[in-house]
Regions:
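Terminal RNA-binding accessory module
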Residues: 1-71
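Short beta-strand micro-motifs enriched in acidic
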Residues: 40-42, 126-130, 185-187
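Short small-residue beta-strand/loop micro-motif enriched in glycine and branched aliphatics
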Residues: 144-150, 191-194, 246
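Carbohydrate-binding surface patches
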Residues: 184-198
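Rossmann-like S-adenosyl-L-methionine
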Residues: 2-9, 13, 172, 198-311
Length: 311
């Protein structure tokens, strides 16, 4: 490890600040273009020790778990909460511009469709049993450390409000010292909670988890892998007026507004098309909307997702 002072020139595609040095580029998380920082360097990775010049585009992060000063560690769920919206949005747009240009495609790229705090309806978190109880949160980048979260400002309140319940379920169903995961989706009928990477719990643990779900309002389904443990309400999402029940852990667009914006774009471009093939159709995000104006052939490798289209 060495120490040096560097000037951040840009933000790389992975979200880290990039500085040029005599030994090549070094990537420094939680920095911004124009900032001068003293870093501890290991190969091409730098950790900020202090700032001697900060960017006027730097803002206070919304989340108490974000960044090197984050509570419980630097949560790996977000990378750029410290950047003002305007330059951040343009950075994301330029990623698309660069990707197209690399393939020889020159075209206009629209401004970023910005999602707001509290809109994300789908999160995947990690859990681990410890001597002190259960830890629920996101992995710190480049480590196996789970940052225990008390809040998640990007997620819908329906998810954040149930974090204590998800912890309890993890405490009941978990075993051993290996981490496991949970995907939580907010649906119209309640939360769809899907645990993964778990050993099969015994009958007592299953019943305890079921009883907990029955006592809690707002829980639609609890699954272990592909096994439905309890389903008080069938999880339902709205794809353009068609109600669909996705399988456990199914892919959904992160926010409903972004999904609608994408669907409007697709529908507009394909208006007048008699036949459409929807590759990687998932649960029908686009297929079911397109079916109102065209004959659609939906293609999807995941059988449970495709089964959700069988209305």
């Amino acid at each position: 490890m060495s120490t040096e002072t560097v000037k951040i020139e840009t933000i790389g595609s992975g979200g880290d600040g990039v500085a040029a040095t005599n030994e090549g580029a070094v990537f420094v998380p939680f920095t911004l273009p124009g900032e001068t920082v003293a870093i501890a360097r290991v190969k091409n990775h730098g950790t900020v020790m202090s700032w001697s010049e900060t960017s006027p585009e730097r803002v206070a992060p919304r989340c108490r778990h974000f960044g090197p000063e984050g509570k419980g560690g630097a949560c790996g769920g977000c990378q750029l909460q410290h950047w003002a919206d305007g330059p951040y949005h343009e950075y994301k747009r330029q990623l698309v511009v660069a990707a197209l240009k690399a393939k020889g495609i020159e075209t206009d790229v629209a401004p970023l469709f910005a999602c707001q705090p509290g809109e994300r309806r789908r999160v995947t978190m990690s859990l681990k049993l410890t001597d002190k109880g259960i830890v629920l949160g996101y992995m710190q980048a480049g480590t196996h450390h789970i940052v225990p979260v008390e809040e998640c400002p990007i997620a819908m309140p329906a998810i954040v409000d149930k974090l204590p319940v998800i912890r309890k379920l993890g405490q009941v169903l978990g075993s051993g010292s290996q981490p496991f995961r949970v995907t939580v989706q907010a649906t119209l009928s309640g939360l769809d909670i899907a645990f993964m990477d778990l050993r099969k719990p015994d009958a007592r643990k299953r019943q305890t988890a079921i009883d907990l779900c029955l006592r809690e309002k707002g829980l639609a389904r609890l699954t272990l892998g592909d096994e439905i443990l309890i389903e008080p309400e069938k999880p339902v999402v709205d794809f353009g007026g068609v109600m669909v029940s996705p399988p456990p852990g199914a892919f959904l667009q992160a926010t409903m507004r972004a999904e609608q914006a994408m669907a409007d774009l697709v529908l507009g471009h394909l208006k007048g098309a008699k036949r459409v093939v929807d590759l990687f159709a998932g649960c029908g995000t686009f297929s079911l909307r397109l079916a109102r104006q065209s004959a659609v052939h939906a293609v999807e490798f995941d059988a449970p997702a495709l089964g959700a289209l069988d209305l």
